[in-house]
Amino acid sequence: MMKRIIALFIFVLSFSMAQLENDQDISKVGTTAAHFLKISSGSRGLAMGSANVAICSDLTSSFWNPAGLSHLKGIQVYFENNGWLAGTDYNYGSFGFAWPGVGVFSLSLTMLSSPDDLVRTVEQPNGTGEKFNAQDMSIGISVGKSLTDQLSLGASIKNVRQRIWHSSGQTLAIDIGVQYETPIKDIILGASIANFGNDLSLAGRDMSLSVDPDPNNQGNIEFVNAQYETDAFPLPLLFRVGIGGHIINKENLNVLFAIDAVHPNDNYEYLNLGLETNINKIFSIRAGYPGIGKKDAIEGLSLGLGLKYPIMNTSNTLVVEYTSADFGPLGIVQRVSLGFNY
């Protein structure tokens, strides 16, 4: 049975790699809504080039692969904040706890917001005196459970909402994932499907207007109230499949690699590569490279550090992480995250 699972996984991975050579003429970029759902959550995952589907094991697993939540013990809290691209702010927070005999549950919040800007019109290009902003938000509940010593499953359900000024839209989405520790020592396989849900469209009082239904005919009705209708767009569906494992696995030194193949519905297929070195189970050095094989990719090298330290000689730990990721012409993104394990 295990050999069949491994063979099937290798077949799926090989098929994903083959897609890198096919269907490269149409990328479908810009054809989905709620693009913030693709922003990598967690300093560790971002530092490792977003190669995390097989090796995730902390609260950010609710983003990468909810099956990874099954590795959590006790109670954990995680938060991160960073200035994202083009002056926007990105925030992610999560709370999780292990329910013995049932599974691990988590609640997560993701927010992407823009600063205030002037409302401009054709008649008033310098501003009307009003200001607007935009905000994307996702609230999700996740569960992960180990079915055996080797196989873990997980799922998430989340409410996805987008707003710009007085117009907004929302929908529901689900994520599912699996992780499998192979009989091959220190090798883990993982796969997940993220953002499977209904299409999303915007509506609100910004869409309201008054029009003359027949401007060429003078009559008693000069203007009637009308409403713009916006098209509905699909969510950014992601299929990830990956492999990870320990190159070195000793008491005081651990070197971990990760490779993910990603098939999105709004871009070309690509690979993510990541590497992590952990010293004394306290200090980590990370590096990664995302977007390999993606045409016109702007992502570059990402680097990161992590510190996991006991609190006052107890089993509780404090986790502090830092990541610097290169986004080419859009600049460098720096991220700091903080976690507590009880």
Indicate residue ranges for each PLM-predicted region.
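Cleavable N-terminal export/targeting peptides
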Residues: 1-31
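Subset of outer-membrane beta-barrel
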Residues: 19-342
